Design a protein with these regions (language model features):
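Active-site-proximal loop and beta-strand segments within enzyme catalytic domains
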Residues: 1-72
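Catalytic loop of the DD-peptidase/beta-lactamase superfamily, centered on the K-T-G motif
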Residues: 11, 48-51, 65-80, 89-220
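Secretory-pathway/luminal and periplasmic proteins that interact with or process carbohydrate-rich
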Residues: 20-23, 34-39, 81-89, 130-137
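The feature captures the short pre-catalytic strand/loop hairpin that immediately precedes
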Residues: 38-44, 86, 160-162
């Protein structure tokens, strides 16, 4: 979302070159710039494979903030404006955000309402970028295709943690066991936090639980 604010303010463009030849800011945010999970060495040509990459996210943020503090940048662009008083960056941009369940609920709802972003920017972020690329969702395996937006994952036809939510649903989960999933068209969202790190328990539990949450939300 913070990069979307930069785009709305005219400070950056998703099409601007970044990293390897042919790569852009959009490639980095959609995990298609060719980096490995924790390596800046090329694992695939740019725009040919979806390889989830913390390095790509960190590199994109570093390129945007320059000498500024990433924590302050996120607070200025997102946290303060949405009223996320319990949320802060306490580590690397790709995996260092901590906060409360309440704040995560507010954050998920902001995507539904497009709080802090132009609607057109929100919709672009949640639309697949190079949607036909194959790739791997960490913990859930390989998918053909493996659609991803400009930050959040897009479900598409993947049968995994998003359960039976519609193809245009988007969200993210982390190694902490937290998740956020939302569908703008249906105007529903679900979040969860955990005291147990992501693992086999989540792979087995989330799909059915998340499907049930959607059923209950649409019936309410």
């Amino acid at each position: 979302m913070a990069v979307g604010v930069e785009v709305d303010w005219g400070l950056h463009r998703y099409e601007e070159p970044l990293g390897p030849p042919g790569a852009t800011l959009a490639h980095h945010l959609s995990h298609s710039a060719g980096y490995g999970l924790e390596s800046s060495d090329a694992t695939a040509p740019v725009g040919t494979k979806r390889v989830y990459s913390n390095v790509a996210v960190d590199f994109a943020v570093d390129a945007i903030v320059g000498d500024e503090s990433p924590a302050q940048w996120l607070d200025d662009r997102v946290f303060r404006g949405l009223g996320l008083g319990d949320t802060a960056l306490e580590g690397r941009p790709a995996a260092g955000v901590v906060g409360s369940t309440k704040d995560l609920m507010t954050f998920a709802g902001a995507w539904l309402r497009s709080d802090g972003l132009a609607v057109s920017t929100r919709d672009r972020i949640l639309s697949p970028f190079l949607g036909d690329l194959d790739g791997i969702v960490p913990g859930f395996g390989r998918f053909r295709p493996c659609p991803w937006g400009l930050g959040p994952e897009v479900r598409g036809d993947k049968r995994h943690w998003m359960g039976d939510w519609p193809p245009d649903s988007a969200g993210h989960f982390g190694q902490s066991g937290a998740l956020a999933l939302f569908n703008v068209r249906e105007r529903i969202a679900v979040v969860a936090t955990s005291t147990v790190a992501f693992g086999p328990w989540a792979v087995g539990l989330w799909p059915g639980w998340i499907s049930t949450i959607r059923t209950l939300a649409l019936a309410s």
